[in-house]
Amino acid sequence: MTFEAKYLGSNGWLIKFDKTNLIIDPWLTGDLIFPPGEWFFKGSLDNEILIEEDINIILLTQGLPDHCHVPSLKKFKKNIDIICPNSAKGILEKLGFTSIKVLKPKEKIMQKDLEIEATAGAPVPQIENGYIVKDDKGKGFYIEPH
């Protein structure tokens, strides 16, 4: 079984299985600014992060900017499969994404060759998502960024 995990900084991960590559909470380009503005929080990347692998799934744990980073999401094809909590859905729809699957804690979905189960995540203020991800051989990982 191939399983590689590459930390991308902030909350981001690139996960490679035998047949499927997924990216979690990508911040790949541009500044990270939390509302109400730069005076509250602004993070900057030293360099843009380039992803050479074909990404099959985007997995978002929250709808907040450090998990659902709009400038980074704009780099992906609009028909890529995205799994997310409800807090990210409206942002993704405004960006034109067409394959959005919203999961609530305890819900599962089969996506490509992966089983993805949402778990209760951080309450910021509503409950966001963690995930248990397993391949077709039952190997996998758990993520909740807090």
Where in the sequence are the language-model features?
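Active-site environment of divalent metal-dependent phosphoester hydrolases
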Residues: 31, 63-68, 89-91, 107-110, ...
